[in-house]
């Protein structure tokens, strides 16, 4: 949460203090978390399927819609930045040592979990633009690999990240494509570092409806 900003002549005249103070008031509103949690619980109880750009999906998934992420001006600009970076990598290290990969969000891969009539942006359209912009032979389609392994949990239910197991299968597929021998999944040891973190999407909704 935002902390009380320090006032200075520079921050006051630039408007930064006012902006930071407004953020501070929003974050430090009394019982803020309780109000957000109650609001989300009421919305879910009244059969709302979405709140704050988050879908209440099947199997207790909280899935971000990312409704504006791919239509913002920065979305196309980022393709250009990545294109330039990859061209430099290919020129410097060679095509065989440069791979571009963008992992799709849960809202794209787990469409079968979304509420009825949900209509998120089609990320595949954007990812195809990214793929087309990359130097030949450098794009790796992680989405296809993930769709082949939908029998496992690919994304955390209450966070936007993919699971470690999902990342493993993409790594293994990439390694095989490059002619490398990937380590077996059994070669890794799973270790739980904490059971008290439910993720960023859970923090936005504060409803705590499921296990990660």
Positions of predicted regions on the chain:
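Extracellular serine-dependent O-acyl
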Residues: 96-104, 119-152, 176, 181
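Structured segments of extracytoplasmic/periplasmic soluble domains
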Residues: 85-92, 133, 170-181
């Amino acid at each position: 949460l935002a902390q009380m900003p320090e006032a200075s002549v520079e921050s006051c005249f630039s408007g930064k203090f006012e902006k930071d103070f407004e953020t501070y008031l929003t974050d430090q509103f009394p019982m803020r978390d309780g109000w957000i949690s109650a609001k989300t619980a009421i919305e879910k109880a009244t059969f709302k399927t979405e709140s704050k750009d988050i879908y209440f999906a099947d199997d207790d998934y909280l899935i971000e819609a990312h409704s504006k992420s791919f239509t913002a001006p920065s979305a196309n600009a980022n393709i250009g930045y990545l294109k330039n970076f990859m061209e430099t990598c290919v020129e410097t290290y060679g095509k065989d040592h440069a791979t571009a990969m963008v992992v799709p969000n849960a809202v794209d891969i787990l469409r079968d979990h979304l509420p009825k009539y949900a209509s998120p942006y089609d990320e595949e359209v954007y990812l195809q633009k990214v793929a087309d912009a990359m130097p030949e032979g450098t794009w790796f389609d992680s989405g296809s690999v993930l769709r082949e392994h939908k029998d496992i949990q690919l994304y955390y239910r209450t966070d936007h990240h993919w699971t470690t197991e999902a990342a493993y299968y993409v790594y293994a597929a990439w390694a095989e494509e490059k002619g490398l021998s990937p380590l077996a999944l059994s070669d890794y040891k799973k270790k739980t570092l904490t059971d008290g973190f439910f993720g960023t999407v859970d923090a936005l909704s504060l409803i705590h409806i499921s296990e990660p």
